Amino acid sequence: MLRNGQNQAQLLARSLGQLARGMASSKRVSSKKEDLKPKLPKPPTVEIPMEEPLNASYLSKTLGSSYRSWAAALEKHPELKTLKRKDLLSSYDTLKSLDYSVDDIIAKPMIIYYGATTLANRHSVLQECGFHNVTVQTLAKYVTVVNKPIEVLKAHNYIPFDVKVAERLAGYFKDIKLPVDLRELESETLTLKSLRQSLINAYLRERLQMDDNDLQKLWRVYTRIRHKSFRAVQDTIELLTKEFNFSAERLRKNSFLLYSEADNVRRILREVPTIDSQDIREIGFRRPKILMSTCDSLKQTLQHVHAFGISEDAVLRCLEVLTLGPDTVLERLRDLQEIEEFQVLGTNPRILRLVHYQNKARLRLDYLNQLRVRCASLHILSCGSEAFAKFARDGSDRTKGRDIVVYLSNVLGKDVQVLRNLLSRHPNWCHIPLLHVKQCLEYLRSKKFKLNEIFANIHLLLYPIKRIEEKMLLLQSPDAQEDLQLPVANFDSLSNNEILTLILYLIESEFHFTGDGIWTEQHTHHVENFNNLLPDFPESLNKVYKYGVKPAEKMIMERL
């Protein structure tokens, strides 16, 4: 249909004749019932709860102590007011489990500003080093303390004089012989920080076969590992190797996992055992960064995804979304409904790529709009920087049609390949933006055309709504009915299917059945002239990581 002008004109004329004969003999009776087809999910009313800043009244009622004490603490440390209540309660529960009272916390109120995991780790480190009484004051000064020489800590009675710190720390490494001479580490002029780092280096050399380069990167990039207890590091490595089948090499390449919490990972195994029937162990192995998210965050993120009618299969197509915070995911899911070009992709199985890359996608969409590029596919909005730069420079205002066929498959309930085969009969179908297809379909639905009737005339979705309206009005005029020699008394005698077929015929007859009827006046021969209209690609793309182009890719940009 519409491939070659003259041949297609003959085909359409023949079809019109058959249509007329069919109308003369009998009128097709429309079905009373129409199968319900899935539509784009409506935005659910999921809101991020708004919290009031922490105040003395809430703290005194929730944690205890007097209103006056907390008021004084908040006045002295106003940054405490920015703490989220769930984080506050989590830190308080940890401090409580470590036998600190509310009065202890009031004495050093900023202690509760630290995260629960940080507090637990630091307390464990000090215990491993031989501190016989870890007070809340000591815990609050943790960074200062571990940077002190061991002899100074013993002189101030933090560590008993008879404790051999190096030997004590080495003893926490079980079932492994450290490749280090402890006699070289017995000097009490060493700081706790340097002693612990020497021992953890020896352990990682033996357990994960890390070399000097691996260790240098570890301490340069993932410095927080030095604040994790030896027992916790070993527990994490054993869990990852046994439950997730991580090899030593894979752990070296993803050394940030050494800071993951073993107890949290165990919770994930128990409470999120599968995603769309796929074992969480396989998922964690594929995307190790997911294991750095808390179990509660993963569960909440999945709840938000479900609330917006997005399947878990979509999660598997973009596992990176699980590395975002749940509040961020919820906010971005809601934002999808605010931008028409994003909202129309709501049923696309790769929709979560727009959630993960939303900031980049917004910038790219704005930039392409400035270039008057209408066909911005989900892939182009979320692909790598090099691919996007090439697309923008080439100036080809077209897609491969995947977004269109996926959308129509969800709405019409038809096979993707069937739709592609039908649409590909039109030479220009890939030059039509998905948003227009959606708007045209909604327009036809508003005129009471059924989905099966639209499917039978699917190419009409590619045409400007204004032209469809014009031809629909034209068909209602007696002159047009006479010119077309329709064997019916009036317009109302035509079936919906016949009306759509005639509209398509009338539009393309003006363009000699070449398929050019899809272009509006603003976009006539848009593709052919696009390269002449394309402005210079902005230099900012080579300097600032904007629209997805990193500074390191400047040479690539120059070659494009």
Swiss-Prot record:
Q: Which domain of life is it from?
A: Eukaryota
Question: Where is it localised?
Answer: Mitochondrion
Where does the transit peptide lie? 1-23
Would you name any one GO CC term? Answer: mitochondrial matrix
Question: Per the record, which residues fall in region Disordered?
Answer: 23-47
- How is loss of this gene reflected in the phenotype of the organism? RNAi-mediated knockdown is lethal. Most mutants fail to develop past the L3 larval stage, and the few pupal escapers do not develop past the late pupal stages.
Single GO MF annotation: double-stranded DNA binding
Q: Which UniProt keywords apply?
A: DNA replication, Mitochondrion, Transcription, Transcription regulation, Transit peptide
Entry's SMART domains? Mterf (SM00733)
- Function description: Binds promoter DNA and regulates initiation of transcription. Regulates mitochondrial replication and transcription. Required for normal topology and maintenance of mitochondrial DNA (mtDNA) levels. Regulates mtDNA replication by re-activating replication after replication pausing. Likely to regulate replication pausing by coordinating with the mitochondrial termination factor mTTF which promotes replication pausing.
- Quaternary state and interactors: Probably binds to the mTTF-DNA complex.
The identity of this protein, by name, is Transcription termination factor 5, mitochondrial
